């Protein structure tokens, strides 16, 4: 719906010719040189087949047949696990609800026609306008996520124990998938998501969260029985690791294994000469939040996760 005095707006998937300008619009907050570098890198990734820009949607003034003013852009990337990762729209006017609505409508239509299984969008809690737009178009709020970060200068001592671990490779893939599924049982971390997404799909999604580090994906064991696992990814530009998943099987919970696994991940990140380890946790998962806080993780930001299933 257009506000009084606002021009009508139309939205559509960006054509190949429109993509450079739309990407530049998305990075409009950056200095010109950095902006052009980001656009060039994304276009190069698409050319190499590492990224698809088919989910790039634009919104223009509707009363101009050609060359209308660009009012917003929104990018969605379809992952191999079937998750369409939607990045919040960038608007020329932060209060341009009509453009936000058209961008989400165009994105949703693209998603419904794609091979995606679910669409996910993370937005900051201060973004009330787009939160309302998401709800109005059938997206459900999944959880409040707390994003946390810890530097690696001073770490707790890495305790020696009988716990062993194996890393991810083709021969251990099935065991990783099985153990991942077992850690979902009675989990407090986004249980609605784990109940509908298969462990196989989830593992594939974690691989795409950044630079894949199979040698640092660890499955922990005690006397031959699997305890749980930690999965990390590297964000090279930022010089840090992200703990994309940590999970413990039910019969090993409450025995300090999550702490042991987490401390080892911190030490591994420091050995890799990273500056920090980051993670995101469901705010409702109070035991996990306390564990991270006690280990020195500090809250950076909170975001709301919204989902939509394929219809």
Model-identified regions with their sequence ranges:
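Acyl-donor-binding surface of acyltransferase catalytic domains
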Residues: 1-4, 80, 92-163, 169, ...
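A short beta-loop-alpha structural element at the N-terminal edge
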Residues: 4-24, 164-178, 185-187
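Active-site rim helix/loop that mediates acceptor-substrate recognition in acyltransferases
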Residues: 26-62, 193-226, 231
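Conserved donor-binding loop and adjoining core beta-sheet/short helix segment
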Residues: 40-105, 109-112, 230-240
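Residue-level recognition of the GNAT/N-acetyltransferase active site
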Residues: 87, 91-93, 124, 249, ...
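Conserved acetyl-CoA-binding loop-helix of GNAT-fold acetyltransferases
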Residues: 95-109, 248, 254-271, 289-294
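Conserved active-site alpha-helix within GNAT-family acetyltransferase domains
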Residues: 105, 125-143, 259, 283-301, ...
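Conserved hydrophobic beta-strand within the GNAT/NAT acetyltransferase core sheet
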Residues: 119-123, 243, 277-281
């Amino acid at each position: 719906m257009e506000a009084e005095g606002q021009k009508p707006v139309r939205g559509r998937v960006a054509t190949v010719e429109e993509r450079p300008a739309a990407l530049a619009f998305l990075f409009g907050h950056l200095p010109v040189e950095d902006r052009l570098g980001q656009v060039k890198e994304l276009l190069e990734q698409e050319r190499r087949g590492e990224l698809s820009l088919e989910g790039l949607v634009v919104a223009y003034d509707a009363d101009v047949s050609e060359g209308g003013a660009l009012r917003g852009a929104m990018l969605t990337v379809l992952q191999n696990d079937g998750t369409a990762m939607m990045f919040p729209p960038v608007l020329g006017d932060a209060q341009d609800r009509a453009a936000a609505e058209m961008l989400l409508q165009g994105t949703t239509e693209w998603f419904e026609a794609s091979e995606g299984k679910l669409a996910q969008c993370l937005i900051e809690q201060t973004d009330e306008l787009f939160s309302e737009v998401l709800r109005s178009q059938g997206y459900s709020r999944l959880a409040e996520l707390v994003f946390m970060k810890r530097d690696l200068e001073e770490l707790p001592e890495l305790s020696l124990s009988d716990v062993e671990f194996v890393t991810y490779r083709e021969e251990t893939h099935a065991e990783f998938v099985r153990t991942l599924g077992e850690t979902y049982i009675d989990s407090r971390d986004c249980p609605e998501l784990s109940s509908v997404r298969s462990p196989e799909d989830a593992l594939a999604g974690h691989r795409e969260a950044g630079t894949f580090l199979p040698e640092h994906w660890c499955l922990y064991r005690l006397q031959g029985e699997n305890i749980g696992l930690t999965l990390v990814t590297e964000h090279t530009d930022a010089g840090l690791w992200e703990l994309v998943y940590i999970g413990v099987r039910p019969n090993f919970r409450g025995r300090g294994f999550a702490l042991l696994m987490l401390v080892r991940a911190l030490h591994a990140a420091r050995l890799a000469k990273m500056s920090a380890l980051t993670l995101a946790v469901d705010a409702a998962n109070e035991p996990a939040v306390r564990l991270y806080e006690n280990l020195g993780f500090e809250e950076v930001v909170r975001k709301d996760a919204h989902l939509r299933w394929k219809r």
